[in-house]
Amino acid sequence: MTELQNYIDGYGFGISVKELASRAYSHMAAKGHKVCIVNDRYLEVDGTTYLFSKSRKHGRWIAKAI
């Protein structure tokens, strides 16, 4: 989801994955999406589960649909 990826692009590696998931949850819920936190690394948005991982190659967080 482009909206989720664009949101987390604003965060560097100084934030924990748990905090990132929490902030992404709040942002997406405020935008009117159906959201739930599966666990520290996973967020479900509108029925699709996303894994948050670090991309050292690109120097940013990645939200990958699984």
Residue ranges and their predicted role:
Residues 53-66:
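Intrinsically disordered, low-complexity regulatory segments enriched in Ser/Thr/Pro
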Residues 2-30:
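N-terminal acidic leader/helix
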Residues 6, 15, 35-38, 43, ...:
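Hydrophobic transmembrane signal anchors and adjacent membrane-proximal interface regions, especially
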Residues 21-56:
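Acidic, low-complexity, intrinsically disordered interaction modules
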